[in-house]
Amino acid sequence: MENTQENPATQSAEDIGSAKQAAQGAAPAAEAADAALAEAQAKVAELQESYLRAKAETENVRRRAQDDVSKAHKFAIESFAEHLLPVLDSLEAAAVDTSGDIAKVREGVELTLRQLTSALEKGRVVAINPVGEKFDPHQHQAISMVPAEQEPNTVVAVLQKGYMIADRVLRPALVTVAQPK
């Protein structure tokens, strides 16, 4: 009968040899895995840095936009006020005039009124003077209805001008409207 058992020393040497071969085969795979891991970690770090930069840039843009809006609100009236200053100068000059000449005062008031109207127009404030137009409840406020020759609901008289700034009614015109016949 043959000895089916191998010598433990021989078996151990074979195991060591095959383990070395396996280790040698695994070493390049482990190195490749380590390299891939290092590359992935570097990519993650790069992406995190890019994310943080983008987040900081977004915050800076948002903050700058808020500052711009705040400044726009704060100084929106600046241009309008600049257009009103000549009107103020004219009124102050009239207040210190002691000549007593009514014709001069009237002429000064008319000039000042033109200056004021011009300043308002530069600020996009325009008068609503709707005589002869159809009554519009968005721009007019009817004070009374009177019998008139015009069509019903037509503005007959303006008691107080209205004003619009851009497309928004600042103050509706107070009007008298023709009543139905």
Curated annotation (Swiss-Prot):
Q: One Pfam family this chain carries?
A: GrpE
**Alphabetized Gene3D superfamilies for the sequence:** 3.90.20.20, Head domain of nucleotide exchange factor GrpE
The UniProt regions of compositional bias labelled Low complexity, in chain numbering, are: 19-34
Q: Which residues form a coiled coil?
A: none
- Superkingdom of the source species: Bacteria
Matching entries from InterPro entries are given as: GrpE, GrpE_coiled_coil, GrpE_head
Q: Where is this region: Disordered?
A: 1-34
Recorded GO MF terms: adenyl-nucleotide exchange factor activity; protein homodimerization activity; protein-folding chaperone binding; unfolded protein binding
GO BP annotations, alphabetical order? protein folding
Q: Where in the cell is it found?
A: Cytoplasm
User: What keywords tag this UniProt record?
Assistant: Chaperone, Cytoplasm, Stress response
Kindly list the GO CC terms recorded for this protein.
cytosol
Q: Which family does it belong to?
A: Belongs to the GrpE family.
Q: What does this protein do?
A: Participates actively in the response to hyperosmotic and heat shock by preventing the aggregation of stress-denatured proteins, in association with DnaK and GrpE. It is the nucleotide exchange factor for DnaK and may function as a thermosensor. Unfolded proteins bind initially to DnaJ; upon interaction with the DnaJ-bound protein, DnaK hydrolyzes its bound ATP, resulting in the formation of a stable complex. GrpE releases ADP from DnaK; ATP binding to DnaK triggers the release of the substrate protein, thus completing the reaction cycle.
Name of the protein this chain belongs to? Protein GrpE
- Phylogenetic classification of the source organism: Bacteria, Pseudomonadati, Pseudomonadota, Betaproteobacteria, Burkholderiales
